[in-house]
C-alpha cells in the first residue's frame, strides 16, 4: 500500500490533545513587536500556546526592561503613575488579544484568551474590584479578555456579580480546596443570576487559577526540618496532590444536577487553570507541574522556560490525574501525622500571594514614576 509518513507528534501537541491547553504566563511589548522565537506569535505557531496570562509581577519585569516602552512613557509625561500603568498595560493586553483572536474563534471562545489583573490593592474590597473590572473590560474592549480577580472572601461576590454582567473572569490566587469549591459555586451563582435576569450565557467563560508550585515551596522546607524518616518521601508531593484533589472537586461539581441544568442553558464549564507551574527546586524535573497534571478541560499557564522544559520531556504523556485521588488524600494524611497543617499552609500562601502582587504593583508604580 501507500506509505504515509506521519510527522512525530510533539510533546506539547500531545499535552494539548489530552485536554490541557497551554498558555504563556508572560507578556511584554517586545513579545508583541518582535518577530523572533520569543514573540507571542512564534510561540502560538511552534509551541501550542493558545492563551496568555499576566500579573503585576510580569508587567513590573517587562517595564524594568523599558526600551520598548520609552515612547509610550514619554507620551504619558504629566499623568500620574496609576493612569500611565493602566494605559500601558491595557494597550499590551489589547494587542495580545488581537494577535490571538484567530485562536479564540477557532476554539469557539474557549482559548485565545488574555488575562489582565485588577489592582491587587483592591483584593479585599468587593465593590472597588467590581468597578475596576468593569473599567478594564470596557477599556480593553475585546471579547477574548479575562479579568483576573483574586479568590479572597471579598473577591467571591465580585466574581458572581461580574459573571452576572457578562464579564469573563479568571479567578486567581487559589490555594485551598475549600476556597476552590467556593469559587466554582460563585461562578454558578453568577450564571444563575444572569439566567434569572433573562439574559443568555453566550460568550461567558471562566477559569480558576489554582496555584501549584508554591505549595511545595512552603511544605518541602517543613519536611526537610523533620526527623521522621517518612518526611523525605513526601518531598515534592503536596503541590501535585493538592491540584489533583482540586480536579476531583471540579469533576464532582461538573456532575451535579445544578451544573447540568446550567450547562443545558448554554453555560460554559469553568476550567481549572494550573498556575505557578515553574519548578523552583532543582531536584525536580522542570516540567513536573505540567506532566503530572494533565486532564481534560484544564489549562496550564507556563513561563517560557517551562514550556521548553515540557517540550523536551521524553516520558509518556497521559491523563495523569485519573485514579490519583486516594494516593493524593494519603499525602495529606501523612503530612498531618507529621504535624504539618494544610489549613495553616494554604492560609499563609493566600496572604503571601496577595502581598507579593501588592509589592509588585508598588514596584511597578515606582518604576513608572521614575520615568514620568
List each language-model region with its residue ranges:
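Active-site beta->alpha loop and helix N-cap motifs at the rims of alpha/beta catalytic domains
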Residues: 54, 58-158
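Hydrophobic faces of well-ordered beta-strands that scaffold small-molecule active sites
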Residues: 20-26, 50-54, 112-118, 145-149, ...
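An N-terminal structural lobe/cap that precedes and organizes the functional/catalytic core
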Residues: 21-23, 35-71
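Short, small-residue-biased leader/transition segments that mark boundaries at the very start
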Residues: 1-7
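Catalytic alpha/beta core domains of metabolic enzymes, predominantly
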Residues: 167-305
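Flexible, acidic glycine-rich loops studded with aromatic residues
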Residues: 266-372
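Glycine-enriched alpha-helix->loop->beta-strand junction motifs that scaffold or abut catalytic
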Residues: 48-49, 141, 158-169
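Active-site-adjacent beta->alpha loops and helix N-cap segments on the catalytic face
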Residues: 33-34, 125-130, 149-163, 176-188
